[in-house]
């Protein structure tokens, strides 16, 4: 599963974005937050973060995005469980403030998280150093424990399937245009790399269902 995590100082806009997603967002979990609105929850988080002046980038934000596949669709409950367990691996405790939102405006749902690194006792529980790498490792470990495919496994399977389909298409096509058509029929888009000096310099092949026309931001 694709994932990202970073530490930063946020404004209320981050929570508002996570809680909106063009009207499709669903808040699926919160912890140590009394308010229902993004703006008030930000004020709660900021008040707790201010208890530890040494922590400047007090928010841990990011997302987990499962593979875009109808047959591999996972439930909201499983996605929440996966996220909470991965967050626990990088230092999140029952005393941290957490908000999780599931977004549905893109081709496949994904979950966003905002966590206060400063817990309700004023202690920083999450180390910023290599947090993206550590969170990715945590997600892969939890995926294996929950019998879910990791991002590495999915990437390998997709590459093997693409090469198999490319071999089939090369056997049928007699020119490049036919190759593009054959691959398109199998669900792939062939994108040429071109420049003025050398013309076509290469190509890349992407699964059409993986092309995301929306710009996803944390």
Predicted stretch roles:
Residues 1-218:
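N-terminal nicking endonuclease/strand-transfer module with a His-rich metal-binding environment
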């Amino acid at each position: 599963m694709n994932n990202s995590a970073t530490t930063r100082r946020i404004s209320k806009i981050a929570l508002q974005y996570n809680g909106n997603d063009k009207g499709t967002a669903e808040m699926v979990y919160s912890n140590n937050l009394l308010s229902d609105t993004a703006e008030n929850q930000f004020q709660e988080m900021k008040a707790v973060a201010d208890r530890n002046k040494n922590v400047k980038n007090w928010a841990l934000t990011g997302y987990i995005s499962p593979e875009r596949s109808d047959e591999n669709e996972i439930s909201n409950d499983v996605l929440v469980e996966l996220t909470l367990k991965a967050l626990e691996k990088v230092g999140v405790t029952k005393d941290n403030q957490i908000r999780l939102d599931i977004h549905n405006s893109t081709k496949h749902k994904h979950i966003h998280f905002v966590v206060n690194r400063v817990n309700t006792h004023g202690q920083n529980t999450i180390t910023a150093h290599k947090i993206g790498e550590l969170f990715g490792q945590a997600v892969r470990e939890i995926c294996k424990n929950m019998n879910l495919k990791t991002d590495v496994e999915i990437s390998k399977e997709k590459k093997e399937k693409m090469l198999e389909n490319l071999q089939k298409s090369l056997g049928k096509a007699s020119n490049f245009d036919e190759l593009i058509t054959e691959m398109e029929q199998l669900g792939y888009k062939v994108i040429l790399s071109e420049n003025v000096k050398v013309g076509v310099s290469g190509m890349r092949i992407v699964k059409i269902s993986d092309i995301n026309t929306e710009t996803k931001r944390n």
